[in-house]
């Protein structure tokens, strides 16, 4: 899907996903960029997506995961009891932003045939409130320096498993 096609879908009218009534023409868009390289291809595409969404009058927040402190999930499942992860880092705010968003853009470079570690770590940490983000509209930005189509497809399938 091209950026233009994605933005066309983004501007289509849909019902708001939150209890707060929003203008049907405007959506709350969260972009999660996981590239550790500020001038990398996936981060650059995130910036282009953001520019188009702002131009279309959407509210946009971009989070660069490499700039955040996000610990890996330890599998303790303390979150199942309290609804919040026991770890004190930036992921709690990111998860709140994911819940508040109508649209979530997941962007990653392909490293060693799959999404990069920063994205995988963030996805793993959504376990506390995973069911509150599955009804969102998702877009994927996946870049690779290799022409190996299977690596791109594998990464997209990983995202689809998370978003379905």
Question: Model-flagged regions — what are they?
Answer:
Residues 2-6:
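Extreme N-terminal basic, low-complexity initiation segments
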Residues 7-10, 17-107, 113-129:
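N-terminal beta1-alpha1-beta2 submodule of the flavodoxin-like/Rossmannoid cofactor-binding fold
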Residues 134-164:
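Short, glycine-/small-residue-rich phosphate/pyrophosphate-handling segment
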Residues 110-112, 145-146:
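Short glycine-rich anion-binding loops that position phosphate/pyrophosphate groups of nucleotides
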């Amino acid at each position: 899907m091209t950026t233009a096609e994605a933005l066309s879908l983004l501007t289509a009218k849909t019902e708001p996903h939150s209890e707060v009534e929003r203008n049907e023409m405007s959506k709350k868009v969260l972009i999660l960029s996981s590239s550790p390289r500020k001038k990398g291809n996936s981060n650059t595409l995130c910036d282009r997506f953001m520019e188009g969404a702002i131009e279309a009058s959407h509210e946009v927040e971009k989070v660069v995961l490499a700039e955040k402190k996000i610990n890996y999930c330890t599998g303790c499942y303390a979150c199942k009891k309290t609804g919040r992860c026991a770890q004190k880092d930036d992921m709690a705010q990111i998860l709140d932003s994911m819940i508040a968003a109508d649209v979530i853009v997941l962007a990653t470079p392909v490293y060693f045939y799959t999404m990069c570690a920063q994205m995988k770590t963030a996805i793993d940490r959504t376990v506390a409130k995973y069911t509150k983000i599955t009804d969102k509209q998702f877009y994927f930005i996946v870049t690779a320096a290799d022409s190996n189509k299977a690596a791109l497809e594998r990464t997209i399938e990983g995202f689809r498993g998370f978003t379905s």
